[in-house]
C-alpha cells in the first residue's frame, strides 16, 4: 500500500544520505514520477525537514519537471522522462540552461520513466534511462512491465565526466 511504500522510501533515503554524508556533502534532487507525483513531493519535504539544520545536506524539492546540476565541467539534467522525447532532450537542455550548457563539456540527462536501463546518445549528449530499485506495483504487473530491481551510483570526475558507476541488484 502507498503508506508502506512512502515510509519505506523516506527511511531508505535517510539511511543512504546519512551514509553518503560521512564521505562528502550530499545534494538531494527530488524528481516526481508520473505515478507518484504528490508522494515524491511529500518525501522531499520530509527529507528537507529531516536535514534542515544539517549543513552537509541540501535538498532541491521544487516543482520543476526538469532539474539541472553542475559538477565541474559536467551538466546533468534530471527528469522523469515521460513527457519529453528523448531525442529532444539536448535542445531542451541548451534552451533551458544556456549558460550552464555553454560552460560545460560533458552533458547527460538522467531519466527514470521506463524503469530499466537504456542509454542513447544524441548530438554527443547521453540520455540515460536508469533502472528502478522499487518493486513493480500492480499496474506495472498487469501491463507486463517487469524489470530487474537495480540501483546505480555514478562516479563523476569534475574534469573528465562520468568515469563509471556502481550497481546494486535488489
What are these regions (language model features)?
Residues 1-59:
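Core catalytic region of metal-dependent phosphoesterases/phosphodiesterases
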Amino acid at each position: 500500500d502507498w503508506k508502506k511504500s512512502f515510509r519505506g522510501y523516506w527511511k531508505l533515503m535517510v539511511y543512504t544520505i546519512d551514509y553518503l554524508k560521512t564521505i562528502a556533502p550530499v545534494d538531494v534532487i527530488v524528481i516526481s514520477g508520473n505515478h507518484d507525483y504528490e508522494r515524491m513531493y511529500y518525501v522531499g519535504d520530509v527529507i528537507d525537514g529531516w536535514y534542515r539544520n544539517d549543513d552537509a545536506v541540501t535538498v532541491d524539492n521544487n516543482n520543476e519537471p526538469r532539474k539541472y546540476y553542475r559538477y565541474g565541467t559536467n551538466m546533468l539534467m534530471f527528469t522523469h522522462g515521460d513527457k519529453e522525447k528523448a531525442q529532444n532532450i539536448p535542445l531542451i537542455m541548451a534552451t533551458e540552461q544556456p549558460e550552464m550548457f555553454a560552460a560545460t563539456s560533458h552533458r547527460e540527462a538522467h531519466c527514470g520513466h521506463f524503469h530499466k536501463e537504456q542509454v542513447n546518445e544524441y548530438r554527443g549528449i547521453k540520455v540515460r534511462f536508469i533502472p528502478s530499485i522499487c518493486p513493480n506495483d500492480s499496474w506495472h504487473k498487469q501491463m507486463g512491465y517487469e524489470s530487474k530491481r537495480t540501483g546505480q551510483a555514478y562516479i563523476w570526475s569534475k574534469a573528465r565526466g562520468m568515469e563509471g558507476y556502481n550497481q546494486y541488484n535488489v
